[in-house]
Amino acid sequence: MGSEALVHVFLVSFPGQGHVNPLLRLGKRLAAKGLLVTFSTPESIGKQMRKASNITDEPAPVGEGFIRFEFFEDGWDEDEPRRQDLDQYLPQLELIGKDIIPKMIRKNAEMGRPVSCLINNPFIPWVSDVAESLGLPSAMLWVQSCACFCAYYHYYHGLVPFPSEAEPFIDIQLPCMPLLKYDETPSFLYPTTPYPFLRRAILGQYGNLDKPFCILMDTFQELEHEVIEFMSKICPIKTVGPLFKNPKAPNSVRGDFMKADDCLEWLDSKPPQSVVYISFGSVVYLTQKQVDEIAFGLLQSGVSFLWVMKPPHKDAGLELLVLPDGFLEKAGDNGRVVQWSPQEQVLAHPSVACFVTHCGWNSTMESLTSGMPVVAFPQWGDQVTDAVYLVDVFKTGVRMCRGEAENRVITRDEVEKCLLEATVGPKAVEMKQNASKWKAAAEAAFSEGGSSDRNIQAFVDEVRARSVAITGKSTANGVALDLAEKSAEINGKVDLVETKTNGKVELVEA
């Protein structure tokens, strides 16, 4: 890995596709700036990543640094269905993680790779507790919009009124944000949310916000300027997005849980801006009736389409969705249905005209950065808030629905209307122009010297400054005491430093 030691950051991810992808992308950005990055998540996900993305145990060079993987057992059997219940899984993950992560940190130090910083994403705020116990600085990557971060912050601290059981239909006015209707705030905050465990999981991070020295966000300054400026006065925020754009990172270093189908050759055969791309992410599950209506709406519209239909997890207890009889035959070569796709490449393909999306933040950032208009089909969580921004603020989309709170099936006629509005006519032209402007702004942000690039460099510089020397027993790698005891012949104070010749941990006399 080279003769000169690299400052080492250790990333711990919640094992969800929407969490793994942005944190791994951040890891590649940090590695490209000359850091050694270790990415860690439970082995149950590591196994899927190895199979889908050809991940190996060898460090992969990225720019001036390297990225490597260390997965850990979460204490449950591979086919344990309780992983699908966050109320049960999150406490288990915390119990195991608080024990095994320190051991992994110490092992890395013993191997000559002392860790200088821990970084986690939402749902696992206890990682900052682990860092604190080891004397390590920590940071957190927020994987939703800054607008949603602001909403959760104000809800957690009770700073503005939110819908309640007594007043379920009130509007919400948050600082530097548009007025949100009761069903446009992140749905986990609804008083009647069917996902109270997700509300607890997200808000858990806000009880630990005083511990990370930096909150990194997968957004960019120009996209959410006002709310970023406001929240930056409260929290140490650095915008580092869009993370999925990284020209220095090899495509082989990916975090997909499923191997993508080869659909690019089919797209190559289609005229420019003629294909509608449909994907509802890794966790949204539609009803069979809704799938049928989308299918018939596609046929009525006559547009070409690429539709991602991911099968539900085997332990989720959900029925396998099927397409209407004769649907594929009627579509012919006009349509293609796959289980998973290389979304970044699909959105960048000249044949794709628009993106029918659930409006998760990863997909939102990818659509904006690719200059892709959207048809907004949010369901729950931050998706409903993201849809407001895509349609009303960024003006790159049309709205097909308002989310699960509507409690209705979107009809085939509504599907057809939205597809045509987003692909032909003056509205489609306007949306494409706006999307192209955001693409240019995103490219400027992540290019060398752009706002996000500067923030990543500033973060790297701060991590390096914090790791210059680690003194005495309060060592950032958690092993100074063990090493000092083995070096009893050294009198006086013992310092633990990382040398610049071989990256090994050495004890030197103070």
Swiss-Prot record:
Residues engaged in binding UDP-alpha-D-glucose: Q343, H358, W361, N362, S363, E366, D382, Q383
SUPFAM superfamilies, sorted: UDP-Glycosyltransferase/glycogen phosphorylase
Entry keyword set: Glycosyltransferase, Transferase
InterPro entries for the chain: UDP_glucos_trans, UDP_glycos_trans_CS
Record carries keyword Transport: no
CDD domains membership: GT1_Gtf-like
Positions annotated to bind an anthocyanidin: H19, G381
Tissue-by-tissue expression: Expressed in swelling buds and young leaves.
Active-site residues, as the UniProt record annotates them: H19
Listed EC numbers: 2.4.1.136
GO molecular function, one term: quercetin 3-O-glucosyltransferase activity
Catalytic activity: 3,4,5-trihydroxybenzoate + UDP-alpha-D-glucose = 1-O-galloyl-beta-D-glucose + UDP; vanillate + UDP-alpha-D-glucose = 1-O-(4-hydroxy-3-methoxybenzoyl)-beta-D-glucose + UDP; 3,4-dihydroxybenzoate + UDP-alpha-D-glucose = 1-O-(3,4-dihydroxy-benzoyl)-beta-D-glucose + UDP
Source organism superkingdom: Eukaryota
PROSITE patterns assigned: UDPGT (PS00375)
UniProt enzyme class: transferase
Membership in a protein family: Belongs to the UDP-glycosyltransferase family.
Functional summary from the UniProt entry: Glucosyltransferase that catalyzes the formation of 1-O-beta-D-glucose esters with hydroxybenzoic acids as preferred glucosyl acceptors. Has the highest activity with 3,4-dihydroxybenzoate, vanillate and gallate in vitro. Gallate is the predicted native substrate of the enzyme, which thus catalyzes the formation of 1-O-galloyl-beta-D-glucose, the first committed step of gallotannin biosynthesis.
Name recorded for this polypeptide: Gallate 1-beta-glucosyltransferase
Organism: Quercus robur (English oak)
Gene: UGT84A13
